Amino acid sequence: VENLLPIGNKGKSNGMQMPTFANAGSLDALAGYITLLADRLQVEDTLLAQEGVKYRTFPAVKIGLLAVDRRTKGLGVRLMEWAIDYVIAEVMPLVGVRFITVDALYDSDVEPAYDASGFYEKLGFEFADPTEPLPPVNPYRTMYLDLKPLIEVLATEQTG
């Protein structure tokens, strides 16, 4: 990750944020990018019933695309950290969102099968529907990250 250089924030003119990185040795070779877009998290049960919230649909920010060059160890985590920080600092003060969502790819057409959900689980994401079947019915599984615990930790660190 040390040899990566930010090469811009593509798409700012249309409101989409997309930080991009290139390898320091070759600025014309894209090392990774991430996109964010508006979404909603729909759940079968009331996700926040213990907090007295009875909704089944919640506004969210979706990780639309996340791509990294396999040679750039740690860039995927770095881009996700940027996205989480950006949503907390820039989006949440303006829009009522509490969740980040992603459709984690499960690709059974490659050997061995590729399951991106483990990457997102390490970052604290949970399955919106843990009983959702894997492919061939559906190659993506919706996952979410509740930002409230992160915000509470940040608030505690700032006051303590």
Language-model-detected regions and their locations in the chain:
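Non-catalytic substrate-recognition and accessory regions of acyl/acetyltransferase enzymes
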Residues: 1-73, 77-160
